[in-house]
Each structure stands twice: as C-alpha cells, then as structure tokens.
C-alpha cells in the first residue's frame, strides 16, 4: 500500500521518482542501498521481469483505476538500475492529466506529494487542489 500511495501522490502532484531498494537511515542522515534481490526471489519467476509484473498486477491493477492501468506507459515507467552492486527499482511517475483516487478497503483515497511526504487530503482541500491542478472538479 505504501508504494501505491507514493505513486498516487506523484500522479496527483508534479510527478516524481520512487526508488525501491533504498532505505533512509535517519540516525546517520543518509540513504542506504539495500537492493531488491530478496523481493525478486519472491516474485513470480524470480526474475526482474517477474518482479515488474508483480508490481503492476499487485499494486497498479489492485489499487488504481482502469485509466491508469490500461494506459500505464503514459504515466509510469519502471526500470532497474545497479547501484553499489545491488539492484534498485526506479519508478518514474508522470503527473496525471486528471485526478487519481486509490481504492483501498472500498474507500476512495486522494493522495498528494508535499515536499518528501505523501499526504491524504479530502473535503474542501481536495476540491481546491483539483481546481488548482486541473482547472475544475475533473
């Protein structure tokens, strides 16, 4: 769900980059490359392609509306990069041309990105955000 919320927040904001396999070490004030190798071993066929397919099916298809899933290449690009001899999943997210709600436990959730945080907004703040970003209540 955390990955889905981050992707939704980027879609509803100005886009952005999500790195899976990078961990923030708050005590040291830096990021640590941990890689996704263990997650890849748990994926369908234990390959990067299987990991990518798992991300798409279990996150994008599950939590996002068909307009995102059916036109994934318009909004999301998934690549794998080798950093410090570990594999990192790099998800590049473009800003959506209309609002995107996540469906979690039969509730519609609207996320935005503020600085380095994902935030849920609702009510009047949601309406104001939609008008600001897309010019209407689209």
Model-identified regions with their sequence ranges:
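Conserved N-terminal catalytic/coupling substructures associated with nucleotide/phosphate chemistry
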Residues: 1-138
């Amino acid at each position: 769900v955390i990955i889905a919320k981050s992707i939704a927040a980027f879609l509803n904001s100005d886009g952005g980059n999500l790195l899976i396999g990078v961990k923030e070490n708050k005590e040291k004030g830096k990021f640590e490359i941990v890689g996704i190798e263990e997650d890849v071993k748990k994926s369908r066929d234990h390959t990067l392609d299987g990991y990518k397919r798992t991300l798409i099916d279990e996150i994008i298809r599950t939590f996002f509306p068909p307009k995102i899933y059916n036109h994934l290449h318009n909004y999301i690009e998934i690549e794998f990069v080798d950093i410090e001899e570990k594999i990192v999943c790099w998800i590049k997210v473009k800003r959506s041309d209309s609002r995107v709600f996540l469906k979690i436990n039969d509730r519609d959730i609207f996320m935005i990105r503020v600085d380095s945080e994902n935030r849920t907004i609702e009510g009047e703040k949601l309406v104001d955000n939609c008008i600001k970003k897309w010019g209407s209540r689209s």
